C-alpha cells in the first residue's frame, strides 16, 4: 500500500505499472473469511505499516499486532511462553511461501514458478530501503535500469527487519531458511491450499 503511495507521489506516470495483487496478509485474510465468515483475523508480525493496510482492507483483516506489542501483552498478563506446553504443528506452506519476508523472497518464488510453468525467466531487480527503492525506480523510469520485474522492500533487510521485530534480522533469516527447508512442499504449487485460495479469493486491490 505505502510503496504504491510512494510511486504515486514521486513517479505518478509509473503508477499504472504497479502490481494490483494484494499482499499475502490481505490474501490470507480474505481466504480465511471466505472459509469461516465469522472468523476474527489477526495479523502478527514485525511490520507497523500493516496497521494502515488493515484499515484499508477491513474486509480481510480485523486487527494487527507487532511482535513487540504481543510480547508486551503477554508480559502484562504474566504469561511466559517458555513455561507453556508445546503442540505439534504440521507446516502446509511451501518453502518459497515461507521465504517471502526474506531479501528477494518474492523474486525467488516468481523465478521458481516460471521454471515450473516452463516460462521464460524475467530480468529482475531488487532494492531494499525506501531511499534505495525510490532511487532505483527513478532509474527504471528513465530507462537507465533494464528490468522487467522490480521488487522493492521498505525495510532494509526485508520484512524480517521491521520496526516491530524483537530479534536481530540475521538470526531470523537463518531460522526462516531452516524452517523453509523443512517444508514438505518443495515447489510453489505444492502448497495446494494456497493454489485453492488463489482460485477462490479475489486477489485484486479494490
Regions found by a protein language model. Name each.
Residues 3-206:
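Iron-sulfur-associated redox domains of electron-transfer enzymes in respiratory
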Amino acid at each position: 500500500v505505502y510503496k504504491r503511495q510512494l510511486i504515486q507521489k514521486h513517479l505518478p506516470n509509473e503508477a499504472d505499472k504497479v502490481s494490483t495483487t494484494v499482499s499475502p496478509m490481505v490474501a490470507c485474510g480474505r481466504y480465511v473469511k471466505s472459509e469461516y465468515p465469522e472468523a476474527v483475523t489477526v495479523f502478527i508480525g514485525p511490520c507497523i505499516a500493516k496497521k494502515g493496510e488493515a484499515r484499508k482492507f477491513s474486509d480481510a483483516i480485523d486487527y494487527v499486532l507487532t511482535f513487540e506489542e504481543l510480547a508486551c501483552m503477554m508480559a502484562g498478563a504474566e504469561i511466559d511462553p517458555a513455561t507453556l506446553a508445546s503442540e505439534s504443528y504440521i507446516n502446509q506452506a511451501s518453502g518459497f511461501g515461507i521465504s517471502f519476508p526474506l531479501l528477494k523472497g518474492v523474486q525467488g518464488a516468481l523465478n521458481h514458478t516460471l521454471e515450473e510453468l516452463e516460462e521464460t525467466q524475467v530480468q529482475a531487480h531488487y532494492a531494499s530501503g525506501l531511499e534505495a527503492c525510490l532511487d532505483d525506480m527513478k532509474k527504471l523510469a528513465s530507462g537507465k535500469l533494464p528490468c522487467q520485474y522490480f521488487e522493492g522492500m521498505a525495510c532494509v533487510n526485508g520484512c524480517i527487519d521491521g520496526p516491530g521485530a524483537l530479534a536481530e534480522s540475521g538470526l531470523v533469516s537463518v531460522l526462516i531458511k531452516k524452517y523453509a527447508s523443512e517444508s514438505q512442499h518443495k515447489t510453489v504449487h505444492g502448497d495446494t491450499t494456497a493454489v485453492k485460495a488463489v482460485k477462490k479469493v479475489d486477489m485484486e486491490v479494490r
